[in-house]
Amino acid sequence: EIEFTRTMHGIMRNISHFCSRTKSRTWGKDGWQKIVVCVIADGRQKVHPRTLNALAALGVYQDGIAKNIVNQKEVTAHVYEYTTQVSLDEGMKFKGAEKGIVPCQMIFCLKEQNKKKLNSHRWFFNAFGRALTPNVCILLDVGTKPDSKALYHLWKAFDQDSNVAGAAGEIKADKGKGWMCLLNPLVS
């Protein structure tokens, strides 16, 4: 759940940045209404229960209502949606409007089977992409902590040039406070 909350809180901070752009023709205080965060979990048995607890704390997941079979047919996935008003930081502390967090529209897709990453991408583009018809899609792996303005800069690349079909951001290792993580050979 720490990796999930790290990523999700980073996304929430980015949405707050979009909403802080009061002089923008596109964004502004209600900019959060133009953004939908889709979280796709690859297999009900594979997702960590504490990650589900974090999603429940955000209001987007309800434990105990998902069924394997409905009307004698196997269920492929469970879809939950909610507009959350709070975020959970890496320390599992709630952050809300008092810390600059704005509402966030969320869709949580809990796949029954673990069918790997490409199948999750297929779900995102074929199911949610077709329904939402977004102008820009940004894919993040769990554990990635986007800088507070990173998603805005990715969006801006598409907005400024209609010929841009893809963009990538820079990934930097988290060095930790006082660069303590550099003592870990996997980070350094």
UniProtKB/Swiss-Prot annotation:
GO molecular function: chitin synthase activity
Subcellular location: Cell membrane
Alphabetically ordered keywords of this record: Cell membrane, Cell wall biogenesis/degradation, Glycosyltransferase, Membrane, Transferase, Transmembrane
GO terms of biological process kind: cell wall organization; chitin biosynthetic process
Enzyme Commission number(s) from the entry: 2.4.1.16
Membrane topology of the entry: Multi-pass membrane protein
One GO term describing the cellular component: cell septum
Disulphide-bridged cysteine pairs: none
Subcellular location, principal: membrane
Catalytic activity: [(1->4)-N-acetyl-beta-D-glucosaminyl](n) + UDP-N-acetyl-alpha-D-glucosamine = [(1->4)-N-acetyl-beta-D-glucosaminyl](n+1) + UDP + H(+)
Role: Polymerizes chitin, a structural polymer of the cell wall and septum, by transferring the sugar moiety of UDP-GlcNAc to the non-reducing end of the growing chitin polymer.
Family statement: Belongs to the chitin synthase family.
PANTHER family tied to this protein: CHITIN SYNTHASE, CHITIN SYNTHASE 2
Name of the protein described by the UniProt record: Chitin synthase 2
Organism: Exophiala jeanselmei
Lineage: Eukaryota, Fungi, Dikarya, Ascomycota, Pezizomycotina
Gene assigned in the entry: CHS2
